[in-house]
Amino acid sequence: MSKVSGSNGGDSKNTLYCSFCGKSQHEVRKLIAGPTVFICDECVELCMDIIREENKTSMVKSREGVPTPQDIIKILDEYVIGQKQAKKILSVAVHNHYKRLAHASKNGDVELAKSNIMLVGPTGCGKTYLAQTLARIIDVPFTMADATTLTEAGYVGEDVENIILKLLQAADYNVERAQRGIVYIDEVDKISRKSDNPSITRDVSGEGVQQALLKIMEGTVASVPPQGGRKHPQQEFLQVDTTNILFICGGAFAGLDKIISARGEKTSIGFGATVKAEDDRRVGEVLRELEPEDLVKFGLIPEFIGRLPVLATLEDLDEDALIQILSEPKNALVKQYQRLFEMEDVELTFHEDALREIARRAITRKTGARGLRSIMEKILLDTMFELPTLEGVREVVISNDVVSGVARPLYIYADRQEEKANVSA
């Protein structure tokens, strides 16, 4: 027991003692009471030292174990189809970034600058998914922000500091871990300057946001309110150094291919003028020739582009790539739905031509890989609605006609060789 009665006088009659070190309440500054135990401030401090030391050790281990670019690409290949050049650029940039952090104290006179990354590519080509997978490989906190919701401080909308707050939340409020995390800012093409001409009205969601992002991307100590900025003005702020946070920005940049195609082309007028042939290359092929000056013409300010020295362009996905995405990666959509059907003890089978038709529809919609799930949901909706109440179904087969909407899925029953085609008229 921590509470001891003594016979040395009135003072020691109800003296309390620390259950861990045995010191009395008179020998320590504070004694914290639990249901049946007490702990002194010195023991609490000792426990904190032990925890800090363990955290430091685990940090050192993670820093020393930076995966090589080849290792990173190998894991990316398991989850992301295609985009070989973009994967190579990203794996080298991420490896160098965390290698720089691992050897930060050994650099001597040479200080290595941070290389943030800009991903440019059509909608649904895998920009966001690449960033998420990278964070998982390196095992660091990751957060995603939508640039369209951001505004300058003092205006309605989200402050840029809220991005750091989300990262801190992803790190369970561990500031050390958050300071080594990855932030992905999506839709940066939507914060481009509204026009080349200076305007009387302030552009708070365009150039203003770019200006606000400059500091946190370059490196600053951000004061982050734990409960979100504007609703609780009296709360204490957490200090987060953004110097070692890796920022990855992404956007579709619709129309950027036209700016690239127009660059360097000489125009002439009159009867002797050469008729300019239309560029019939795919968007992804044109984007390979991207230069920083093209992004300036698009509407990003030079200072913002300067904070993103690594440029990686992604190609639009063709039919074959979309079929691979449907069936090959570890968490491919087909495998996900097959797992769902397995929970009902039913096997789900897709014909090859059905997958091809799904890919064609995604290309027609111009939604890339992102549109595949909505197409799959529409195809399988009725089946998933009926299946839990049907008895004896062992297999569901999806053909090209099912995807085209001219037939219902084929149900194969186990107890009899009966097939229910449900072909619609």
From Swiss-Prot:
Protein's UniProt name: ATP-dependent Clp protease ATP-binding subunit ClpX
Q: What does this protein do?
A: ATP-dependent specificity component of the Clp protease. It directs the protease to specific substrates. Can perform chaperone functions in the absence of ClpP.
SMART domains given for it? AAA (SM00382), ClpB_D2-small (SM01086), zf-C4_ClpX (SM00994)
Query: Which HAMAP family would you find in this protein's record?
Result: ClpX
One Gene Ontology molecular-function label: ATP-dependent protein folding chaperone
Gene3D superfamilies attached to this UniProt entry: 1.10.8.60, ClpX chaperone, C4-type zinc finger domain (6.20.220.10), P-loop containing nucleotide triphosphate hydrolases (3.40.50.300)
Listed A to Z, the keywords are:
ATP-binding, Chaperone, Metal-binding, Nucleotide-binding, Zinc
GO annotation (BP), single:
proteolysis involved in protein catabolic process
Which residues of this UniProt protein bind ATP? 122-129
What's the name of its gene? clpX
- Residues covered by the ClpX-type ZB domain: 6-59
Q: Which family does it belong to?
A: Belongs to the ClpX chaperone family.
Name the residues that bind Zn(2+): 18, 21, 40, 43
Could you name the Gene Ontology cellular component terms for this entry? HslUV protease complex
Q: Which Pfam families match?
A: AAA_2, ClpB_D2-small, zf-C4_ClpX
Q: Which species does this protein come from?
A: Agrobacterium fabrum (strain C58 / ATCC 33970)
Subunit comment: Component of the ClpX-ClpP complex. Forms a hexameric ring that, in the presence of ATP, binds to fourteen ClpP subunits assembled into a disk-like structure with a central cavity, resembling the structure of eukaryotic proteasomes.
